Amino acid sequence: MKKLKVMTVFGTRPEAIKMAPLVLELKKYPEIDSYVTVTAQHRQMLDQVLDAFHIKPDFDLNIMKERQTLAEITSNALVRLDELFKDIKPDIVLVHGDTTTTFAGSLAAFYHQIAVGHVEAGLRTGNKYSPFPEELNRQMTGAIADLHFAPTGQAKDNLLKENKKADSIFVTGNTAIDALNTTVRDGYSHPVLDQVGEDKMILLTAHRRENLGEPMENMFKAIRRIVGEFEDVQVVYPVHLNPVVREAAHKHFGDSDRVHLIEPLEVIDFHNFAAKSHFILTDSGGVQEEAPSLGKPVLVLRDTTERPEGVEAGTLKLAGTDEENIYQLAKQLLTDPDEYKKMSQASNPYGDGEASRRIVEELLFHYGYRKEQPDSFTGK
């Protein structure tokens, strides 16, 4: 029996963090020929993750250009992937989540009648402009995908409501938790953490396209109020490379000695910063999944989330982008021990560290290399 030719395609830092455990898992199985392709939609931040997990791509399309539009990213990725798929002819292409690379990769595969497996399938907000462009990217990828690897039961239900075939959906847990299990380390230290010392550290991430402009201004004003009121609080903000984000961050925090504006952290550093934080303010999707495993409350700086399981479990709260609301919720976590304890002890509904194994074993079952289907993630 010939080997199963599997190609993983990704292009951004968040994708790379979640695909890295799967890439490493695929290499363990003699039945599989694994190819790694990166579009490098985010060049520098992607390379940090590849280096951290010791992954060398087989194909690097290197499409990154400064301030390129969504249309340019899509068209560049589509043309380059079209050429690659024509040459390599994989049996299945695995894409992740909701980036422009995800959509372009699935569309290019469809044009060649190559099967598509969608990792982290079924997340939905129901608003095609929130998050933008991610919500529609994942819906369109879902329309193309042949196999849907849903992280949770809720994600599976979303797909069933869209009339996806039940036997094409597999609940695996989220590969983000697989990654976390290998990166958080006892005795971790960093010069920035030394500067924070014994103060309470709030870890901030803010970069989403739909939050640029007034929403981000409101977030930053709320954070200024928090550090102005609480002398034992410091904020660490690894600032995204987007020039618009960097300009706003330096405008609001450039003169603050208790808001540390630092370069984007490598994945191992970021996970360990999160583990040592008091709580997290974020508009990132991945952080919403990772923090529950670390016992850290999360205030989500968005009006919607495609990860309602965390809200239901109690570890996430939607803070939105209103200055007063963000301020009040952050203040509550700093002054109400019971509320902090309640949020920090919530269970993680997103994974158990076995998602990558389940995905690979499901592929082998689907293509006839294994007789038994793997277990599903139950979230318990």
UniProtKB/Swiss-Prot annotation:
Gene3D superfamilies: Glycogen Phosphorylase B
Key words, A-Z: Cell wall biogenesis/degradation, Cytoplasm, Isomerase, Teichoic acid biosynthesis
Superkingdom of this protein's organism: Bacteria
GO CC, one annotated term: cytoplasm
Root EC class: isomerase
Metabolic or biological pathway, per its Swiss-Prot or TrEMBL entry: Cell wall biogenesis; poly(glycerol phosphate) teichoic acid biosynthesis
GO molecular function per UniProt: UDP-N-acetylglucosamine 2-epimerase activity
Chemical reaction(s) catalysed: UDP-N-acetyl-alpha-D-glucosamine = UDP-N-acetyl-alpha-D-mannosamine
Signal peptide (UniProt feature, chain positions): none
InterPro entries for the chain: UDP_GlcNAc_Epimerase_2_dom, WecB-like
Chief site of localization: cytoplasm
Coiled-coil annotated spans: none
Enzyme Commission number(s) of this protein: 5.1.3.14
Subcellular location: Cytoplasm
GO biological process entries: cell wall organization; teichoic acid biosynthetic process
SUPFAM superfamilies named in the record: UDP-Glycosyltransferase/glycogen phosphorylase
Family statement drawn from the similarity comment of this UniProt entry: Belongs to the UDP-N-acetylglucosamine 2-epimerase family.
Function in brief: Catalyzes the conversion of UDP-N-acetylglucosamine into UDP-N-acetylmannosamine, a precursor of the teichoic acid linkage unit.
PANTHER family: UDP-N-ACETYLGLUCOSAMINE 2-EPIMERASE
Protein name: UDP-N-acetylglucosamine 2-epimerase
Organism: Bacillus subtilis (strain 168)
